[in-house]
């Protein structure tokens, strides 16, 4: 009897000793610069499918990167998600990401939408298009990014700061196509055409174009869709005054950027991190991830209304600016 009690006590001790390890395997610590309502369903579905609980910290990109760096080897973060290839490249250049070996991710995410060493992956895409006031310009006047620097547009162009990652990424893509000298000349021409000093975000540029404060600007596509889908009649009415051009259809195509993420080098839950990244590449998650910010799925086989809508409206050729950042580490 005594020996049976000893064996039982030993078994119970071993079982309780395993509990912390098992609990750790069922947790994912996510640092995310995304904050959309649809993400709640995205995360809860992952937990329901895998049993892995997500602990999420949201914040601005720069703040999260700085936090990860300050936490160092003791950081609890497993996955970092952000927007824009330049921000992913910056985190990678700081040595924050670890390569992920995953057949699922390599098969689902196109090569041009992931880091060559699989340090990070795109999970949605957006285009940086030209917008113009329909009463003042024709689409042919601004058919290409080059047109934004032409003297004919002097005093007619609005822009957010050139130092913003969205514009930095566009500039990097143009360097990839034109080279540094031509891109610098183009940038000087763009500055010479400013109707006012750069200010605000993309939505502010759309409003300025619609109001006639300037004739032309550039914007990420999801800002346009937000206004088109707005519950405010004045937003939808404003969009009737704005035309959209998918630039450079006769050459290299419209600049495409991404939202994405990767597994952190110091991740304490690496298996959970890989499972989560693979989940983000699933058909179900791709729809949630893209629709949350009116973007397109990174997985080309995923059907999505936004993709079909814009193809009907003239998007025939697009190019990603991701490659330049991947090679610049």
Residue positions per predicted region:
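Periplasmic solute-binding protein
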Residues: 88-96, 115-143, 171-172, 256-262
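Early extracytoplasmic/lumenal segment of secretory-pathway proteins
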Residues: 24-89
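A structural signal for short loop-to-beta-strand junctions that line the ligand-binding cleft
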Residues: 75-80, 98-132, 146, 156-159
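Short beta-strand->loop
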Residues: 31-34, 98-106, 116-117, 120-121, 132-134, 140, 146-149, 233-255, ...
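Ligand-binding pocket segment of bilobal, Venus flytrap-like solute-binding proteins
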Residues: 166-167, 173-247
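Sec/Tat signal peptide C-region and signal peptidase I cleavage site
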Residues: 19-23
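Mature extracytoplasmic/periplasmic domains
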Residues: 259-318
């Amino acid at each position: 009897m005594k020996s049976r009690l000893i064996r039982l006590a030993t078994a119970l001790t071993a079982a309780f000793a395993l509990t912390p390890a098992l609990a750790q395997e069922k947790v994912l610590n996510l640092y995310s610069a995304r904050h959309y309502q649809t993400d709640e369903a995205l995360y809860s579905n992952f937990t329901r499918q895998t049993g892995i609980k997500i602990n999420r910290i949201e914040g601005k990109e720069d703040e999260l990167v700085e936090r990860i760096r300050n936490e160092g080897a003791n950081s609890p973060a497993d996955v970092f998600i952000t927007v824009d290839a330049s921000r992913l490249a910056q985190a990678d250049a700081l040595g924050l990401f670890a390569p992920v070996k995953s057949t699922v991710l390599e098969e689902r995410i196109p090569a041009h939408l992931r880091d060559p060493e699989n340090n990070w992956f795109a999970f949605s895409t957006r285009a940086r298009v030209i917008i113009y006031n329909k009463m003042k310009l024709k689409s042919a006047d601004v058919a290409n990014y080059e047109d934004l620097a032409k003297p004919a547009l002097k005093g007619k162009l609005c822009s957010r700061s050139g130092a913003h990652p969205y514009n930095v990424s566009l500039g990097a893509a143009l360097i990839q196509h034109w080279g540094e000298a031509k891109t610098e000349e183009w940038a000087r021409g763009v500055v010479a055409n400013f109707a006012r000093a750069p200010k605000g975000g993309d939505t502010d540029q759309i409003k300025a174009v619609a109001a006639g404060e300037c004739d032309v600007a550039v914007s990420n596509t999801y800002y346009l869709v937000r206004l088109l889908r707005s519950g405010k009649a004045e937003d939808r009415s404003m969009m009737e005054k704005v035309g959209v051009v998918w630039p450079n259809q006769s050459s290299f195509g419209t600049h495409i950027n991404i939202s994405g993420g990767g597994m952190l080098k110091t991740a304490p839950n690496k298996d959970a991190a890989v499972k989560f990244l693979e989940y983000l590449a699933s058909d179900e998650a791709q729809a949630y991830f893209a629709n949350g910010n009116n973007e397109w799925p990174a997985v080309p086989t995923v059907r999505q209304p936004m993709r079909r809508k814009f193809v009907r409206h003239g998007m025939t050729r697009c190019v990603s600016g991701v490659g330049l950042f991947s090679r610049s580490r």
